[in-house]
Amino acid sequence: MASQGTKRSYEQMETGGERQNATEIRASVGRMVGGIGRFYIQMCTELKLSDYEGRLIQNSITIERMVLSAFDERRNKYLEEHPSAGKDPKKTGGPIYRRRDGKWMRELILYDKEEIRRIWRQANNGEDATAGLTHLMIWHSNLNDATYQRTRALVRTGMDPRMCSLMQGSTLPRRSGAAGAAVKGVGTMVMELIRMIKRGINDRNFWRGENGRRTRIAYERMCNILKGKFQTAAQRAMMDQVRESRNPGNAEIEDLIFLARSALILRGSVAHKSCLPACVYGLSVASGYDFEREGYSLVGIDPFRLLQNSQVFSLIRPNENPAHKSQLVWMACHSAAFEDLRVSSFIRGARVVPRGQLSTRGVQIASNENMETMDSSTLELRSRYWAIRTRSGGNTNQQRASAGQISVQPTFSVQRNLPFERATIMAAFTGNTEGRTSDMRTEIIRMMENARPEDVSFQGRGVFELSDEKATNPIVPSFDMNNEGSYFFGDNAEEYNN
């Protein structure tokens, strides 16, 4: 991409740093995950969790949610100003699962947010360590992406449920910063913008006054983030039109939906990072590993190696398949919910099946579920190979616009063809090419029509043996060319509800 010089790497976004060299980036990312690990160990001590209980992913998620809630200033302020019955704005908590007499018990815990903040800062050399908090948010977002479908949210904003592969990061909180913006898919950004425009249509004062000025700045910033994800001049020019609109309304919504559809073939660049549950970092820190000294990267071999020798457990409901639960968490750990299943299966070294065939529900257990029948099992999070995470979207032809698939946003930089149903996609583009964006629309449609499903993306890129940490010998897999690999095929997952 032409603007490479001004872009910060993900790790810089992740750690809020200015431009750093590779060693400094590795050290600051290492400091970030090390802090998460130290915090987790301290929380396990506070809660008197056994080693086994501390490795339970459900306990990890509760602890992660507590610290995110403790630092959610906006919500904390809101809760103090709007006291609701039975909710203490100064406390946070959740379910902690303990092993008692061969059974799992649920215990609801409550902590002062102030106390949680103190423990977090203490684990992070006295700093607020926002980067670590964002990292946890992205892990939760990746888990949601693998677990839930967003059909309802898509339909509500007038988008097509088949555009689900554009929805990465759709459950990330607003406060997730630059690192959060980097991992949001095109559809997620479009949805946020459409919601904003709809509010403006329904509420006359939305764009007015002092508040309206701030709203406008946020609107233009979101437009610029989305523009930066597109890789063709015509798509970017259309984003300029949307951004500069005096009074955003239905025309802009139309343009945005058009752009979202076009991203199914002319894919945007969306970052992928392997963000692991806090307990995984905790295990490593506890075993004496010094993340800051050794350095760490979210997009290289490090997360694979970490998962290779961490044992994490999960609660399993009576009719769930532990192997399927493992697949769900593996996909979340590598941000691979929207990756081609052929590629994921090859890297994992075990068949990764579409979500419609999974016998498992989400990882979190609802408060009304019966604990009597709960069992636990080891999550199999190891992989056969490792591969570099991408942020390019996998367009061929010098990484410009070309073939995509109606259901993939590549995670791994691995050579493959991107099969897609051109007929399905192009059917959505009949008719409307008039209006002020007509020439751009025509240009975008032309590029899409010229895209060939047999083109190879990530030419020459391969996977690596886990012993090959310097990535010297790429193994380029060969895939069955016509077998399209969408995770969301025949989907029957639950909807995401906050």
Swiss-Prot record:
Recorded superkingdom: Viruses
UniProt modification remark: Late in virus-infected cells, may be cleaved from a 56-kDa protein to a 53-kDa protein by a cellular caspase. This cleavage might be a marker for the onset of apoptosis in infected cells or have a specific function in virus host interaction.
Other notes: SC35 was derived from A/Seal/Massachussetts/1/80 (H7N7) by serial passages in chicken embryo cells, thereby acquiring a multibasic cleavage site in its hemagglutinin (HA) and becoming 100% lethal for chickens. SC35 was then passaged 11 times in mouse lung, yielding the mouse-adapted variant SC35M.
Quaternary structure (record): Homomultimerizes to form the nucleocapsid. May bind host exportin-1/XPO1. Binds to viral genomic RNA. Protein-RNA contacts are mediated by a combination of electrostatic interactions between positively charged residues and the phosphate backbone and planar interactions between aromatic side chains and bases.
Keyword check for Ribonucleoprotein: yes
Name of the protein described by the UniProt record: Nucleoprotein
Summary of the function given for this chain in its UniProt record: Encapsidates the negative strand viral RNA, protecting it from nucleases. The encapsidated genomic RNA is termed the ribonucleoprotein (RNP) and serves as template for transcription and replication. The RNP needs to be localized in the host nucleus to start an infectious cycle, but is too large to diffuse through the nuclear pore complex. NP comprises at least 2 nuclear localization signals that are responsible for the active RNP import into the nucleus through cellular importin alpha/beta pathway.
UniProt family annotation: Belongs to the influenza viruses nucleoprotein family.
Localization annotation: Virion; Host nucleus
GO MF term (any one): RNA binding
Motif stretch (Unconventional nuclear localization signal): 1-18
GO biological process: symbiont entry into host cell; viral penetration into host nucleus
Keywords, comma-separated and alphabetical: Capsid protein, Helical capsid protein, Host nucleus, Host-virus interaction, Ribonucleoprotein, RNA-binding, Viral nucleoprotein, Viral penetration into host nucleus, Virion, Virus entry into host cell
Residue ranges of the motif Bipartite nuclear localization signal: 198-216
Chain residue ranges for the region called Disordered: 1-21
A cellular component annotation (GO) from this entry: ribonucleoprotein complex
Membrane spanning residue stretches: none
Organism: Influenza A virus (strain A/Seal/Massachusetts/1/1980 H7N7)
UniProt-listed InterPro entries: Flu_NP
